[in-house]
Each structure stands twice: as structure tokens, then as C-alpha cells.
Amino acid sequence: MQTIALAVIGGTGVYTLSQLDDVQVYEVETLYGRPSGPIRVGMLFGQRVAFFARHGEEHALPPHKINYRANIAALQQLGVSRVLALNTVGGINEAFGPRTLVCPDQLIDYTWGRVSTFCEEVGSEVLHVDFGHPYSPLLRGCLLRAARDVDVSLVEYGCYGVTQGPRLETIAEIARLRRDGCDLVGMTGMPEAALAREKGLEYACLGIVSNWAAGCGDGAEITMGEILSNVATVFRN
């Protein structure tokens, strides 16, 4: 197979990458089961790019039921070395309102019960990977430069608080995340980032702010319609 320059993982509201040309579809089996869906590989701006939807193409997988290990292992089996994760998130920091694009540099993991390592099988090597900087500086740099080159507004920092889901958070929970230093909240950033690090993949996140987190902004009730509408607006622009 020809080298794949980049894999893109789609989040809520991003179930296809319609710009891909000459698409080949791969149904990948891994030691950890099947990934969230077929992986589509095609040409984008002269580069081979892979894409799949983290929640499945019909959004059938809630955050805590996603087979994160199979997703990362499948990309590695296809020869992927760089992964751009699209994550639909809520804004906590007052500077990160709906339809803002953010390239976070830190995260805090509040999830529980998710299989978060490849180091569980008998005979597997136990890896204590350095996770001080959870996102690849190399890939983050590429993303930030690309945004500047095409004059796209992209916030260059932020701490992503990863919660369990699938429900949204309470106002008190968001207040806690704010005190902890979180700027954004979402449900799928972990264990995906840690698994990518264990496999030696360059991994970065592009956060798409779809709504204010509970108790932030105007304090209005958060609806799925608002989330999907704001994500669609970002991609139309």
C-alpha cells in the first residue's frame, strides 16, 4: 500500500470526508476487534489521507462504548503514522465560544472504566510512555502553520477535559473542570490520545466548539440540534 500521509478521525457531526478522491474502503480486523467503521483512504490535495468516523457512520457508538484500541490499531496496520483527531467539544473558557476552532495542548482525563492501554495481553511489553505533552508538538506545529497559511482562525492552546458521557455535564461539574484549568470539555479525547502515544503515532486534536458547556455563555439549554448545526457551519465556512 502507498504511504498514507495522515489519518483523520471524525467526531460528532463529522461522519464523512467528502473531499476525498479515488477512495478505497478498508474493513480492518485487529487483535482488539473491529474499529468503529470502514476506513476510507483517498487523495486529498495530492496526499493519501485515511478517514473514519469515531462514533460510526450512523453515530451508533456512545463515547464509552467506542473500541479505541481497535481504532488506533487499525490505523497502525494500514501504515499510518500521523493522526488528526476531530473532537466536538463544549466551551468553558469565555474566549472559546461556539464555532471556535481550538488546537489544545493539554488534557485532563475524567473518564473511568475504559480500556486505556495496549499493555494488558499476556506477554505484552509494559510501556510507561511519557505523556507530559499529550499531543504531538510536530503535528500541532503543522496544523497551526497550515491554519495561518490559509488564514483560518485557530486558537493555539487549551486544556481539554475529557468526561465519561454520554450525558452532558452538570453546572457544578463544569465549575469543577474550570477550577481544574480546563478550557474545553468533551467525551472522546481519552483514551485515544494515550493509545496513539503507546503505538508511537504522532497525534493532535482539532477541537470544534459546538456549544457552551453547562452554565457557561448565556446558560441556555444545550440541544443536539445546536451541536450539529454549529459543527456543520464550521465545515461550510
UniProtKB/Swiss-Prot annotation:
It catalyses: S-methyl-5'-thioinosine + phosphate = 5-(methylsulfanyl)-alpha-D-ribose 1-phosphate + hypoxanthine. NCBIfam families: PRK09136.1. CDD domains: MTAP_SsMTAPII_like_MTIP (cd09010). It is an enzyme of class 2 (transferase). The record marks E169, M224 as: Important for substrate specificity. Homotrimer. GO terms for biological process: L-methionine salvage from methylthioadenosine; purine ribonucleoside salvage. Belongs to the PNP/MTAP phosphorylase family. MTAP subfamily. PROSITE patterns: PNP_MTAP_2. HAMAP family: MTAP. Disulfide bonds: none annotated. Pathway: Purine metabolism; purine nucleoside salvage. One of its GO terms (cellular component) is cytosol. This is Probable S-methyl-5'-thioinosine phosphorylase.
